[in-house]
Amino acid sequence: MADNGPPGLQFEWDADKAQANARDHGVTFEEAQTVFGDPLSRTFPDPDHSVGEERLIDIGSSTRGRVLMVVYAERHGRIRLISCRSVTRQERRYYEEG
């Protein structure tokens, strides 16, 4: 796992899930890490998918300039990436109106 996130944060993910996400959504988990360095990112809970563990959603700009939605869980002090994709128009508006 590459360390592209902001200093002080540790990331992890399932390698097969990361490969499938890149194939299906055109976004790598390496790029997704960089969203956590966006000071304007917006974070909110994902109660509909929080079965067994709390999942969170972060919408922010990557270092490639793309606004992404990243789904993750916090486990043992690490951020476990679950999925990421480019935002919809409505999600982009939510981010921009911050």
Q: What do these predicted ranges mean?
A:
Residues 1-98:
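Ribonuclease/tRNase effector modules and their secretory precursors
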